[in-house]
Amino acid sequence: MSTIVSVWAREILDSRGNPTVEVEVSLESGHSGRAAVPSGASTGSREALELRDGDKGRYLGKGVEKAVDNVMGEIAENIVGMDALRQVAVDNALIDLDGTDNKDRLGANAMLGVSLATARAAANFIGMPLYQYLGGINSKVLPVPMMNIINGGEHAPNNLDIQEFMIMPVGAPTFSEALRMGAEIFHNLKALLAADGHVTSVGDEGGFAPNLKSHDEAFRYIMRAIETAGYIPGSEVALAIDAAASEFYKDGKYHLKGENKVLSSSEMIDWLMDFTQRYPLISIEDGMAEGDWEGWQEMTVKMGDSVQIVGDDVFVTNPDILAQGIDEGVANSILIKLNQIGTLTETLDTVEMAKGAGYTTVISHRSGETEDHFIADLAVALNAGQIKTGSLCRSDRLAKYNQLLRIEEDLDDEGIYFGPYMASHFGLGEE
């Protein structure tokens, strides 16, 4: 009854108006599952490859008809008849069928759509919420949201080099209260920026994208917004950034155009450390470029005891690369993006490896998103404790937050919000 009987795909649009793949997997029982695949703007060079058509006369070359054809042709031919409850077998069949290291034959976008839709179909067949099907009876931790409220870098047309400035409502007692705090801070920030004559248009992930004098000014605006909303920076709301340093790393140096600085790896680390000493900044993602392995090691040694050092481009959700990082002392946390690796099974393998090594995990969206909220369920399924899914506007971001509200309601008293644990770990609010 849980046998896959059909696999269908279509080309839809993501939050940037670019094509992406949506897949539907149907079972003999009549149950089905649907999944849409996200896409990134700042990408790691070793990510699994999303297949694009390259026809400049159609969607400027970004069409995904080839990936759709692969799903409905070769992939469907090979997985129809398989049991949707055997996720590992389905994903291994996809991997073997593609036969490449970076999934560039069938396309990671084609493969991931099938993988996630299969999991949804299986959950629907059993009659379980997706988070519980994926994680089991102990899935109960509601994640701390990393809310991106000021955008820069590749996500916004402004003069900020750091790609994301985020707030983390660690002092909230529940996820729903954390979401309320974030929304209030977001609206207060908008008012503060507008009062000073700044444009309040938003970037790809829903954060504001003002032209500011410096990165320091961005931090100061956020601190003011937290206080204006009636909260205490540090004990109630911590800060996080995604530097996306690979985007401004050239010839072995970090070129900060907004600051008019060219820094060595050590100088870049010192520049970031200065922010952690003056603001309640507890998490830094991609503070070093993916190719600056020695810089990553130095940063981890200097800051790893007091700051969450998150690897995104450097690890690309790949268990083999993560294993090397663990062995060589690179980072203490990993960002998890499903489409960087291309199947659900490989994603879960990476998370297990990270947790086994004592690394924290942050489940993440991409800058090109859809209304699909799979990652909200995944964050709870894995008890990850943290989720990064954008700002407090744009429905593609809010879809994930709203799903977490539903999950919190479903868990009722059994649900645990991770914020107080993070606050305790980082000593926030201590004298």
Curated annotation (Swiss-Prot):
- Its name, as the record gives it, is Enolase
One of its Pfam families is Enolase_C
A single GO molecular function term of this UniProt record: magnesium ion binding
InterPro entries (UniProt xref): Enolase, Enolase-like_C_sf, Enolase-like_N, Enolase_C, Enolase_CS, Enolase_N
Q: Which GO terms describe its cellular component?
A: cell surface; extracellular region; phosphopyruvate hydratase complex
Protein's UniProt keywords contain Metal-binding = yes
- To which species is this protein native? Oleidesulfovibrio alaskensis (strain ATCC BAA-1058 / DSM 17464 / G20)
Signal peptide positions on this chain: none
Q: Which gene encodes it?
A: eno
Please name the pathway.
Answer: Carbohydrate degradation; glycolysis; pyruvate from D-glyceraldehyde 3-phosphate: step 4/5
Which parts of the sequence are annotated with region: Disordered?
A: 27-47
